[in-house]
Amino acid sequence: MPRSSATARKSHSNRHENGLVGPGKKVNKQKSNGNLNGNTNGASAPNSGPSTQVDWPASRSSSDSALTSSATTASKVNGSADTSKADGNGRGLLNGYAKGNADMSYGQTNGAVPQNGGLAGQASRRTEKPATGSKKSGSINPLQLASTILKSCPMYDTIAILIFLLQLPPMVLTLVQFLFASLTFMPPSGASSGSLTSNFDIFQGPAGTPSLGTMIAMDGFCLLFWGLFMWTWAQNFALDLAHVQVAITLGGGGSGKNGGVNALCVGIVLVLHLIRSKGIQDFVIGHLLSAKIVSPDFLSQYSHLMPPEFRRTEPQSSPSWMRSLLAVHILAQAGTAMARRSMAKNRSPAPPRNGKRVDTEASAGSQTQIDSAFESGASVSSYIGADGQLVTPATHKDGRDRLMSAKKRRRQANQVRSRQPFWAALASTKVTVMREYEHSRALNKTGRGLMMTEEDLQGISLDDGLVWITEVDSSTIKFAAGDFSSVDDPALAGVCETARLGNDETEPFYVCVNGALWATATITKVQDAPKGSNTVHWRGEVSGLAPNCAYTCSFVRSDTDEEICVMSVKTPAATDAEQVSSIPTPPQPSYRPSSPTTTLKNSIVNAEVKLNEKRARLRKAKNDHKLVISKIRKELDNYNHRLQSGTDENRQKQRSLQLERNIKQTEEITAALESQLDNLENIPEEELEEWSTQKSKYEQELEQLNLAKEELVSARAAVAREVSSLESELNSAIQRKERLQGRRTRVNEQYERIVSANAQGLNERERRAAEQFAREQDQAKLEANFHEQFASISQSVQEYQVRTNQLWQQAAAIEQAIQQQQQQMLLDSAPLTPEGNLPGTNPLTEAPGMSLGALTTTAPNTRSLLGLSFPSLKSSPLQHASSPVGAASSHPTSPTQPPSYLQHFPTSPLGNTGNYFDMDFTYRDRSFSNRSAHSSLYGADFLDSNRRGPFQLDLSDTVIEKRMDSGSEGVTPNPIMRPISTPFQRADSRGSGSGSGSSGASGSGSGSPSSTGGKGN
């Protein structure tokens, strides 16, 4: 059936005379005359196989117009026209037969390779005969055309194939995917290993397909992505996407602008997976039930209408590894195809304005669409010459030079073949199968290289006068014919019967080669031919032909001069090396039959060449025969001489006597040997005894040898054990030696490092020791200074206490004086009332010589307290000029003279100074380079002194503890002064020592780093 109504309207564009053409390809029409290539109907022979279409006209005579007008041309194809077979066997095979009437003209060709891969299907005749069989039918039946031509419908084909694939069982579907994946590894025709010239060739490959490295890389990347990032649902979805890719490829959905087809197929698969997903079903049903849109009763009532594969009760399982690998490969190649399409779209020029739909991937590797037109029309305008080269007209030659190279044309052809729609491929398969089935019976022996015989023509009637070719040689053509006595025309039958009655050997037909009567054609009748429909009655041979030339053989009846059939035959090339070298080969022999004159000239030349060759061979044979005759004569003379010299009787007698003597000597030697054998059979007793003694000696020697061997083995074992022990000891000694050597090297290295360090750091140590000694001396001096200051501070405290008592006494005296002054003022003042003083309010009398000014005196650098002046206090004890203990007192005198001993105590130096042990006092930490714990200047208790609060210490206790810790023996603390503790507790040094303490005096000691005790000063 037609796929659409447009088939009838556009049937002229769907007639592919040159075979199946890919989608979007334009087929060039043949504009030249078909008779130029030997085809009267204007149709070119296909160039896609070994088969060749052969047409002969049905008309035999120009006078019989009725027969020629009603005749039809029947053609059949005979494959297996193998060029290599024809060249290797040195002969071609052409079998055919033709009817004797005008109903049918049939021919079969099998032999030398003519134009376009087979024997040319030429329907040429002699120039005076009209070619009436070349008429074409002006009208085309749409139904008949639709039954042979299938229109490409990518969308329908792709969707139909996808639906078909989704319904297949898993096992069959896996097999389909495996077959489809194996197609990507099949090398296309014309594939060759070429170098990569650009980035596009990486995706394209040398023959229009992706290269093997690209396929492996894409498969590996997709397999890694499949295993790492895809869950079970995604894997099953990708598995069905592989079905989509198979359907798109087989249905031609990837050709042209069919993005809608791809999106539709992917959408169908996605919707199916979403509907089948258990999670989505639970979500939708739960949402409907929660929103009260659908009731549970309604769902339970109509749930049986849902297909069982949509009602999932358990989650999906992961696909098998085989299906996963196939899906990964198919999807990887789909991604590669998408990349190739995009890159080809960028490389291809702007599309034409006529709106033709072109497959970008099918056009990969070509610049324009002219390549496809040239490739499809190449078989129309070109033909193969005698030497196997392609011969084209001048116009097509110029156009071919402007097209792409042969590599890109081959790549484009492979792309078109790979992008062929599925239904077109089925149609091509059907045509090929039917054609092979029709001719399988006739080609079963030809395919094995055997000649076809008359027994192979089963089912063909030969009783109506047929002629067929049996063998084609380089210079001869052999043929056979049936019986011409039984024909349909009664008049012709009467003529043949009359001729047979007159002479049985009369030839019923003759042969014309290229329109000329061929005199060297011989026709003989088969003797004793049995009666039958398929019996050979006539055999003939056309000789005198030139090799590698085209001939038109016409078989004409002898009585009516009517053509029985016309056959175009091309003789194969000569296989004889001498003949090939002697015959000049024309530069470009044409396949068209020559004229009669040219044919005769070529035959004459060929005959002369053969005659010359035969003469040369004859001369050579004569020379060879002469040499052989001379050799034979020499041998004959030798034999004659030997015969003549061998006739003497004396020589014969001497020879016979010599032979008799030889016979007697041989008999005597034989008898002696027999006697020796008899003696050897009877062994003497002496020899037996000697043999037994020798045997016993041999056994003893053998035992000694065995004992020696055992001793040797044991000795070897002992020596081996000793050697192994010695080797083990040697190995252990070597190991110890290696360890000692390693240790020695390490010690040497350490020694060298120490020596170098000592050499470099000797001065540094001396300098550090000197600095340490200097620091210790400074610390000792500072400690002595501190002791002196502590003593002065304690004395100042005592003086301050005495001064405080004195001040209290002065304050009491001042208060008493103030009271007296107030009483005096009351006495000296006026009375409080006009009447006078009240009783009891009389003031006291003024004390003579007492005035407040006498009580208060102000001296410079003193502070006044209620009119009293006090001397200024001393500054910090860290000042360079410390106050002496016996300094004169500067306090003012009071009315009451203080004791004399108080005048020797100055004011306290702590009056206007801060605490010496507050947070403002900083110290320097011990250096990290000084790692000696015994040479530290400060104890562990003093390290965090700046991190503590102010010392609340009693200075007297500090002084006592310091003196006790200094190591002075026999010195008791001052009972007047309280002991003062100090945080400066010097640690015992291994190389230094100090001491202090005496009653009323101070002492200090210091020592060098090499001293063992302190010295007192």
From Swiss-Prot:
Coiled coil stretches, renumbered: 604-783
Ranges of biased composition (kind: Low complexity): 58-75, 1007-1017
Keywords for the protein's UniProt record, in alphabetical order: Coiled coil, Membrane, Transmembrane, Transmembrane helix, Ubl conjugation pathway
Stretch list, region Disordered: 1-92, 106-138, 339-368, 575-599, 830-857, 877-907, 964-1017
Compositional bias ranges of the Polar residues kind: 30-54
Subcellular location: Membrane
Residue stretches of biased makeup (Gly residues): 992-1006
Membrane topology: Multi-pass membrane protein
PROSITE patterns in alphabetical order: PTS_HPR_SER
An annotated GO cellular component: membrane
Key word Protease present: no
Transmembrane stretches, start-end: 159-179, 212-232, 255-275
Function in brief: Component of the regulatory network controlling carbon source utilization through ubiquitination and deubiquitination involving creA, creB, creC, creD and acrB. Involved in resistance to acriflavine, and required for normal growth on a range of sole carbon sources, including fructose, cellobiose, raffinose, and starch, and reduced utilization of amino acids, including GABA and beta-alanine, as sole carbon and nitrogen sources.
Family of this protein: Belongs to the acrB family.
Record's protein name: Probable ubiquitination network signaling protein acrB
Protein source organism: Aspergillus niger (strain ATCC MYA-4892 / CBS 513.88 / FGSC A1513)
Lineage: Eukaryota, Fungi, Dikarya, Ascomycota, Pezizomycotina
